[in-house]
């Protein structure tokens, strides 16, 4: 689903609904579109869903770490003047959410993590993603979800583009 991305200073984000903010942090190869179901569901239940675009590929390589990403989230929360948030993080976003919550527990009403780094995960097996092999990436993307149909062509294309972009290589 296409969303209107707001830009305010260094922040790019999608914001849907009114109420207690649920800030959703995407993973390393994730994007805002990964959360279409969540962003459609929770505003109807009285929540504001906020999906900031993390600066994963735009930060200086020496500042590309969990602590810097958590600071970015903290700056975003202050920018939006949120007092209490629900924080939901997936994969790398889960790791960032854990660190943020440790550093700023007073502002986190609830924490939800899925597939957070640091937890056992075997989606890529014991190998690295193979560049240029679309079918390999498609299969691995399908393995991430309980229902492989969730790994739409758009999601697979996004992961394939990221894996094959040497500038985004971390």
Regions found by a protein language model. Name each.
Residues 36, 74, 98-102:
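Short, hydrophobic alpha-helix immediately C-terminal to the catalytic nucleophile
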Residues 39, 44, 50-88:
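Active-site loop/oxyanion-hole signature of alpha/beta-hydrolase fold enzymes
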Residues 131-170:
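Conserved alpha/beta-hydrolase catalytic His-Asp/Glu region
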Residues 21, 48, 83-86, 107-110:
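Structural signature of beta-strand start/N-cap positions in the alpha/beta core
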Residues 89, 93, 97:
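Gly/Ala-rich beta-loop-alpha elbow adjacent to hydrolase catalytic centers
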Residues 98-103, 108-139:
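Flexible "cap/lid" loop of the alpha/beta hydrolase fold
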Residues 1-10:
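N-terminal cap/lid segment of alpha/beta-hydrolase-fold proteins
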Residues 12-59:
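Conserved HGGG/HGGXW glycine-rich cap/lid loop of the alpha/beta-hydrolase fold
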């Amino acid at each position: 689903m296409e969303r209107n991305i707001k830009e305010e200073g260094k922040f790019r984000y999608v914001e849907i609904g009114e109420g207690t903010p649920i800030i959703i942090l995407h993973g390393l190869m994730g994007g805002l579109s990964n959360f279409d179901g969540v962003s459609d569901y929770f505003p109807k239940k009285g929540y504001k869903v906020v999906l900031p675009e993390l600066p994963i590929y735009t930060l200086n390589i020496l500042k590309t770490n969990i602590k810097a990403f958590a600071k970015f989230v903290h700056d975003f929360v202050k920018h939006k003047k949120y007092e209490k948030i629900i924080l939901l993080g997936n994969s790398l976003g889960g790791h960032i959410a854990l660190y943020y919550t440790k550093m700023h527990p007073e502002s986190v009403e609830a924490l939800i993590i899925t597939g957070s780094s640091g937890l056992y995960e075997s989606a890529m097996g014991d190998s690295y993603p193979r560049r240029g092999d679309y079918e390999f990436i498609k299969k691995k993307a399908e393995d991430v979800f309980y229902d492989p149909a969730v790994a739409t062509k758009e999601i697979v294309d996004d992961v394939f583009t990221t894996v094959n972009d040497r500038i985004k290589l971390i």
